Amino acid sequence: MKTPLEAIARFLLKLGLTADHITLFGLAGQLGAAVLIAFGHFGWAGLLVLLLAPFDAVDGAMARQARVTSKFGAFLDSVTDRYAELALLGGLIYYWSQQGYTVGVMLGFVAAAGSVLVSYTRARAEGLGFSGKVGILSRVERAIVLIVGLLIGKPIYSVGIIAVLANITALQRIFSVLQQSKTDAR
């Protein structure tokens, strides 16, 4: 029996779309949400991001069904995820800077740095042959936290949570690699 995700993937493939099309469509939608955020339309942006969330899973299902999974597709998906997340946080930073809300701007930068470092520490760890999946706040969790904050009109709380927990996650990954490297050295 096909899952709803597989049915959607099959339908989109029949329309002539590819997994990469869906990945880029998702990014375009996220950039649109970032613009909404920049102008203070948090609820609409949260709704748009929520509606776009399934596309992040559909592109992979499409690639598997079409039997065209590729390293480039996985790479493109990861890169567009980073662009999308940074665009959303950038929209908030812009909005708060226009409001003169320095605390929001600073938290936005710390959250953005943490988010990038969560991804970077995992990629670098895995590139060196270590496991880099540990931590309390992966991309999916960060997205959920941000969506909730946008939907309730209080993204500052979400960004504060992301700023703290994303950086803790990056540190957890650093310490995990340190432990793994000590085990490797023996």
Show the residue positions of the predicted features:
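A feature for the membrane-embedded catalytic helix bundles of lipid/isoprenoid biosynthetic enzymes
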Residues: M1-A9, V79-R186
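Active-site flanking loop/helix segments enriched in acidic
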Residues: L15-D20
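Short, flexible coil/turn micro-motifs enriched in small/turn-prone residues
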Residues: H21, F55, V68, R124, ...
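Membrane-embedded alpha-helical segments that form the functional core of polytopic membrane enzymes
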Residues: T23-F72, T102-A113, P155-L165
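Membrane-interface alpha-helices at helix entry/exit sites of multi-pass transporters
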Residues: G73-S78
